[in-house]
Curated annotation (Swiss-Prot):
It holds the Pfam family UPF0223. InterPro entries: BH2638-like_sf (IPR023324), UPF0223 (IPR007920). Gene3D superfamilies: BH2638-like. Belongs to the UPF0223 family. This is UPF0223 protein Bsph_1378. It comes from the Bacteria.
Amino acid sequence: MEYSYPFSTDWSTEEIVDVVQFFEGIEQAHEKGIKREVMMAKYRRFKEIVPSQAEEKTIFREFEEASGYISYPVVKQTKEAADGTIIKIVPKKNR
């Protein structure tokens, strides 16, 4: 699947790379799972670049529209899980 990652023109090249790596972690959590510690490190770096909650929500929405992957459940599970846990989003079955 080809799509563009959301980013700001105000970010440096390094920041853009780090945000793309964060979203690659979101993709991995949806597809095959990612270690909690790895995802948390990616999220912490993302929050250094995007400290505003409102901007985070906007970027998450843009990423979801482009990719179909929802970021919030991954972040929530990452924050709540213990170290050593694999973060994996299981799709909900239609009723």
